[in-house]
Structure formats: C-alpha cells, structure tokens
C-alpha cells in the first residue's frame, strides 16, 4: 500500500481553452454562499454513489466510479494518484477552488468537453450548497493518506478476468457458487482510456469480421436501428440524437446528421408505433420523456420536442440513464429509472405498518424518500396520460430494456450494487415479470440479504426473483438487443437467430478488471438457460488501460452488428463472411479458442 500526500494548492494560469470554457466566475475566489449542511444532504442523495466524502480505514483514499472528494478544494485538477481521469480533466491545468467547482457542476460536459462526469447540478442553490459542503472535506492536519495498490496481471483462475476473455468462452454463473460478502476487499480500479495501441486486437469468432464504422462521436451511448435501416445514436453529453445512413454491406455511413439537439441527458430511443411505419421517435432524457414527429427517412427533425412525461422521479442524482420501450402491441410504454445510490444508504426507516401502506400504492419492495420511483421499471401509456406506476421494483440500475420481438417478453439489462467484493453482486439480463421484486436494496439474487441492510426487511425474504442470466460481477451490463435478421449481406448464421447480444461497459469495482466486451446470450424459443458466451473481446490493454468501453449494440439492416463505445467515441461493425477466419482491420492475434465454465 503506497503512502503519499495530496499535492498542495498552487496557482496556475488557466490555458486559453479554459479561459474560454470557464466563462463564469473563473477569476472569482469563491462561489455564491451556500449551506454546507444542506449540501451534505444533497451530496448523499445525488453524488455519493460515485464519490466518497471520507477516508477509509487507515486513511485509505476511497475510489469509486469517480475520484475521492476529500481535499478536492485546493487540489490540482486531475492530480489524485491512482484515479484514471479523462484527458480533458488531466489537462485542465488549474487548481480547484469553490468558484471553479461551482461553474463546473453547472454543466460538466459543456464546461469541460471530454469529461465523463454526466450529471449537472442545475439549481443554483443546490450547487452553492454542495460546493460549500465540498469545501469542508479537508484532510486532517498531519494525516498521510494511503492508496490501494492494484495487480497488473491475472494471478488467479477466475474465468471472468480480462486476460481469460476469448470469443466462444462460455460462462454460466450460478447463485449457489457466489462468494460471501466481503470475501475480498472492495477495489477502486477505474480504467485509463487510451488510444488504440499499434498492436491492438479485436477478436471475434471464426467467419466474422470487425471493422471501424464511424469515429469522432461525442459520448455515444445507446444505439437503435429504425425500421428503414437508419441508425440513431444518443450522444448523451452534448444532449443530442445523431442519425447515420448506410448502404447494405458498407463499412461506413453515407450520411451522418444531428437529428435533434438541445436535450437534457438523452439516452433511450424508441420508435412508435412498433412495426414498419413509426410516426414518432421517443427519447428518454435524464428526467423526462419527449417525442418528435417522424416519417421514415427523416434525417433531421423540424419540430420542437413534445413532452410526454414531464418528470420521472423527484431526484436525478446517481444513475442517470433512462430507457424507453413499448410493448409488442404498442399499448404500454415502459421506462427504466436507476437508483440514486449504491444501496439506499441514507433512506429513512419506516414502521411495518408504514411499509404495508406504502407498498399497497407503490408495489412490493418499492423504495421511498429520495429513492421514490428509482430502481424501478415504470409503466404508462404511450401518450403519458396514465399516472406512472411500478411495473417491477428492486432493479438497481436497469440501464436498457428490450422487448423480444417474437415472445413479447420485456427484458432488462442491469447494473447491480458495488462494495461487497470482487465476486459480488452479479450484473444480469432477465425477463421482467409484472409486479416482480428483484431484490435491491435489501436482497440480491433471491434470498441473499445485503449485510448493509441486515434484518431490515425480513418480510421480503424469499420474495426476490432470481434473474435469468447472471453476468460477471461489476461487468457493467449496458445495451442488449435481439438478433432477428434472416437475410442481408452480413447476416449471421441461423443458429444466432433469436439470441441476444449485450454490451459490457467494463468494471471499476474489481481488483482485476472484467467486461469491456460483447457477449451472446443463448436463447431457445425466447427462453434462456443461464449461459452466455464471449463474442467480441480485445478492448483491454492491461489492468490499468483500455482503449474502448462498449455501450450500445444494434442489428443493422444488412444483418451486421453495430457497436458503440464511449471511451474513444467510435462505432464498430461486425459482419459474417462465410468461410473466412475471424479478422479485424486491426492486427489480430490468432490465439486458440478458450472455453471456461463456472
């Protein structure tokens, strides 16, 4: 374990870039006065899922998805050792003070293009309060902080470790084989995103090719294909929806336009009504659902967004992705809303009588307070006339959903909780049962109680549903799509038809990283057996660096699989070319297929 002290504050003249970016308060010494007590409450409800405000045991700096904020005021931007900042933050060239934090938090991705900090604090009072609280997070005088040392290479036999990934590798995680909580310590191992090394490889199964399809995308997230074959991409940071057009068999788009902009954290995209002739494009923003009139072939909207659901929840902090899909018959609109926290640490307690009354109105296992309408799949009608209600609860962060076009089943791809060690808790994809409770925050994977809520909800024992397909813990399961193509220049072999593909964004809360790949979930008549296979791997350079983070996956008009990754802002195209060995437009290692089971 390495010991060090944070760098002391020092004055640095901002670069011309920063002078332009930080146009408000850049020369001020302080932010507007705020209330630190209110700021602490706001932080706990909106920021604590990604940032720690305290040191750990033995003065260990606690890393989460975001850096520790202990000592942030007076610290040079991007300087905290052992946290892999984006290049944009590393190159800021100044020291954080309250004025700069106040401006940054107003709209992080606008103030510092390239940062992955997704959530603004738009309300000036809340922003002043949280900055006032951050100013209180000081390192005690005389204290030397410590940083966790992380391994560089795989030292064990875990088949989920990044060095053991290979197309065709099989995984079948089972609840009975899960470790106990805290069997290993909770690691803070964020990746450093680098440009693709000269020897970078992407591996796919024999017969497939993978090529770069598009680049220079800004924060590309979810991607969906319109019935006519146009490709719609949510660029969440800039607040816009991009559309690309391509010809069958082509390795690049022929058109690349911005369909709509000025949106607030857009992520989910859906075409309505279902079928070949949609009339609307729905977009799930951070805390609303809007739609645009649409005719097949439109590359740019000429209309203002129509608000369908003005507010999804009372709070927007924590997990910020929202998705929208429609039932197969088009009568219901489903919305996924992730939790505001890791495991509802600050949620106040209720009496058994209060819980019974609450669940009568909100559903079994529904959370309350700042977690109201969070960690749920919500449902209403496509016009938003019916009040939002819980379709399923206990789904910690259902990042994306998909409706099986054959069976009509609603599926969700979910990020589970952190902090219980490398081996807990599995992320998952699963069919969603109406009225179902999936465990968060009190239980996980069925009747496994989270020790951080021990004995809090004995009434929920044996009521949590075990998901269909358990993924390696901390994989960060993002978009999923069903493969239904039956023809086209790049169509996959028939045995892929009906299966699902899932993008795994990759771990941060694991000593040896995992994920950063595309997996294939095996289905028979729409029913999973719990197994998934590695399909595309190769984005990890070492246990410190990666050159891609998969987010979105969709099936193109010609049967190819299109993949977005938000590390370097690229899109990749995977096509099947009969009788050809797996290849990429990057050099590829021809290592033998590895099969691992668990």
What are these regions (language model features)?
Residues 41-55, 67-71, 99-106, 115-118, ...:
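C-type cytochrome heme c attachment motif
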